[in-house]
């Protein structure tokens, strides 16, 4: 497992109570803005090639939200034959569908060029949606660290004290082990499930991968990151989620 993921799991903890509420599988979970951008591949946008790239980018971004909705929450495409734009976008599966997904992507497509005004390679995360574009094809199986993470959120309301941490960790690990197999069997690359814990708590888990991501990578990261939840989760947090540009996990009690 790349060290960058372990570091993020330990140090990048953002309380969900600071974020705007929107619906999910259970009524007490919140998701919202994660101020995140990565700008790369800066160049001369005033050159002939840069001007053509910007034209292609505007066309790609203008149709991206509707393309994501038509494609069930995930999209990968390109625009242009020369100085082409290649991009992808994904909405988290527990966003209210389709309104929130579409409106958040509309905001992301409007802000991405402003956030990285001279970049040919841009990654943006906004309210449970991710958007990325490049000036060349990018294969999901390359060593692209931007596919890995941008945030870990903890849920702090309706807190419950779990006294048997070892049993909780094992139950949660077993749940995500199972979801790591189920998610790659789903055409939408989404899976969810429940596990009883101590006969008193129902543990809900959700796993999602970017649909064009290789299935072996999807299964690997769902399994491994799900297992690492126990290293950062205290016994008083009621839930946790892990967001990246290629996969998303969350668990909560209900």
What are these regions (language model features)?
Residues 2-254:
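Extracellular secretory-pathway ectodomains and N-terminal mature segments of eukaryotic proteins
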């Amino acid at each position: 497992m790349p060290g960058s993921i372990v570091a993020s799991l330990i140090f990048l903890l953002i309380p969900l109570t600071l974020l705007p509420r929107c619906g999910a599988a259970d009524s007490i979970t919140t998701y919202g803005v994660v101020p995140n951008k990565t700008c790369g591949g800066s160049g001369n946008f005033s050159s002939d090639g840069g001007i053509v790239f910007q034209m292609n980018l505007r066309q790609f971004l203008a149709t991206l939200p509707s393309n994501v909705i038509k494609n069930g929450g995930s999209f990968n495409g390109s625009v242009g034959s020369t100085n082409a734009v290649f991009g992808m976008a994904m909405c988290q599966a527990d966003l209210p569908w389709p309104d929130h997904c579409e409106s958040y992507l509309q905001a992301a497509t409007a802000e991405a060029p402003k956030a990285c005004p001279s970049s040919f390679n841009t990654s943006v995360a906004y309210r449970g949606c991710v958007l990325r574009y490049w000036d060349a094809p990018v294969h999901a199986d390359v060593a692209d660290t931007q596919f890995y993470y941008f945030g870990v959120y903890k849920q702090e309301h309706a807190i419950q004290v779990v006294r048997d941490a070892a049993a909780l960790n094992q139950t949660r690990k077993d749940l995500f082990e199972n979801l790591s197999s189920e998610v790659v069997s789903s055409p939408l690359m989404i899976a969810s499930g429940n596990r009883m814990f101590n006969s008193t708590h129902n543990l809900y888990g959700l796993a999602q991968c970017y649909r064009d991501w290789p299935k072996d990578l999807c299964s690997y990261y769902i399994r491994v990151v799900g297992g690492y939840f126990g290293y950062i989760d205290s016994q008083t947090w009621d839930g946790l989620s892990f967001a990246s540009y290629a996969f998303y996990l969350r668990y909560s009690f209900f």
